[in-house]
Amino acid sequence: MKSIGLNLSGREYKILIGSDLLSETATLLREAIPCDRVVVITNIDINRIYGKKLKKHLESKGIESLFLELPEGEIHKTLDMAAHIYPQLINHFAERNTPILALGGGVIGDLSGFVAATYQRGVPLIHLPTSLLSQVDSSIGGKVAVNHGGVKNIVGSFYQPRLVIADTGCLKTLPEKEFACGMAEIIKSAAIGSSELFRLLETNTQAVKDRSPEVMEDIVSQTAAIKASIVCQDETDRGIRNILNFGHTLGHALESTSSFSQSHGAAVAIGMCFAARLSVRLGLCENETALRLEKLIADFGLPTNPKDIDPDKIIEAMHHDKKVSDGRIRFILLKRPGEALIAENILKPDVLSVLEEMK
C-alpha cells in the first residue's frame, strides 16, 4: 500500500493506494474517524459488484451501514438527486459525525461530496473510488458539485474528504470504455506535470492496457501525487491549480453541448488535442509534442477529434467555464510534455480556426 499525504493549511488527509483495500475499509476508516455508523452512497452497478461484500465487512467490524443506491450517469448529478438523498439521511438519524462513504466513480464522488458538504453544514466524507478516473483525479482535492441548467459542475464548493481509499483491485472489473476515460486524466497529469510519466506511458502502453497490478499501482500513485502536490499549492483553484484543467475547457463544453452524452474522459481527450494544436498555432510548443500527445491518446482508444460540432455553440459553452475571468476564457496550453501554462487573451479567430481544423 502506498500513502500520499495532503496538508492544507493544517488540515491533513491521506490517499491510500493499493490492491484489496476495500477489505480493510473499517480499520482504515477508524484510524481517521472513530465511528460505528456510516452512510454509503453508491450506484446500481457498483452496489451489485461491491455492496454486499463491503456491508458484510463493515458489520463484521461493528459498523452499522445504510446503503443508498442511485441511478448511473452524469445526467443524475443534480440538485434534485441531492434533494432525494437528504430525507433518507434525516430518516436514518445521520448526525454531524456520521461519515458518508462515496463508493463509486466521479459522479458518485461529486454528488456524495456535495451532500456531505451541505447536510448539517458538513459531515465527514470518505472517498472509496472504484473507477480509474476517480482514483487519480476526482476523489482528490475537495471539489464537490452538481450540474444545473445544462452546465457541468456549476453549483458546488470545496469540501475536503477525511480519507481516500483507492483499491486498485477494482480496476480489474472496469469496462474498457471506463478504463480509457481514466487514462485520459492520467495522460493529462503526465502532460502538465511529469515528462517521466509521459514517457512511461509511451513505452509501457500495453502493460497499462493489460492492467498489470504493479504497473497500475505505480501510475495511479504517480498521478495522484501530481494532483496532490498542485492542490497543496492552490486549494481553491485561483492560480496554479488551473493547469489541472488542461483539456477541460473544450472538454466541458463538449459534455454540456451534448447534454452529457459525451463521456468525460473522451471529451477531455479531445480537449487536450485541441489545446495542444492551439499551442502549436500560437508558437508555444513544437508540432512533434502535439503529435506525441495525440498518438498516446489514440493508443489508449480515446478520440482525438470531435464529431458534429457547432464551433459557435462550443465557444458560447466555453464562456460558462469556471476559469473565465472578466469575460475572458482562460486556456491551459502546452509547452512540452510535463510543462503547461495558463493563457488569457486568446483570440477567437485562433480558437475557431483550430475547431474548424478538427471537425
Swiss-Prot record:
It is found in: Cytoplasm. It is an enzyme of class 4 (lyase). NAD(+) binds at residues 72-77, 106-110, 130-131, 143, 152, 170-173. Pathway: Metabolic intermediate biosynthesis; chorismate biosynthesis; chorismate from D-erythrose 4-phosphate and phosphoenolpyruvate: step 2/7. Gene3D superfamilies: 3.40.50.1970, Dehydroquinate synthase-like - alpha domain (1.20.1090.10). One of its GO terms (biological process) is chorismate biosynthetic process. Binds 1 divalent metal cation per subunit. Can use either Co(2+) or Zn(2+). InterPro entries: Dehydroquinate_synthase, DHQ_synth_AroB, DHQ_synth_fam, DHQS/DOIS_N, DHQS_C. GO terms for molecular function: 3-dehydroquinate synthase activity; metal ion binding; nucleotide binding. Its main location: cytoplasm. Keywords: Amino-acid biosynthesis, Aromatic amino acid biosynthesis, Cobalt, Cytoplasm, Lyase, Metal-binding, NAD, Nucleotide-binding, Zinc. Pfam families: DHQ_synthase (PF01761), DHQS_C (PF24621). Its EC number is 4.2.3.4. Its cofactor is Co(2+); Zn(2+); NAD(+). One of its GO terms (cellular component) is cytoplasm. The keyword NAD applies. It comes from the Bacteria. Zn(2+) binds at residues 185, 248, 264. It catalyses: 7-phospho-2-dehydro-3-deoxy-D-arabino-heptonate = 3-dehydroquinate + phosphate. Belongs to the sugar phosphate cyclases superfamily. Dehydroquinate synthase family. Catalyzes the conversion of 3-deoxy-D-arabino-heptulosonate 7-phosphate (DAHP) to dehydroquinate (DHQ). This is 3-dehydroquinate synthase.
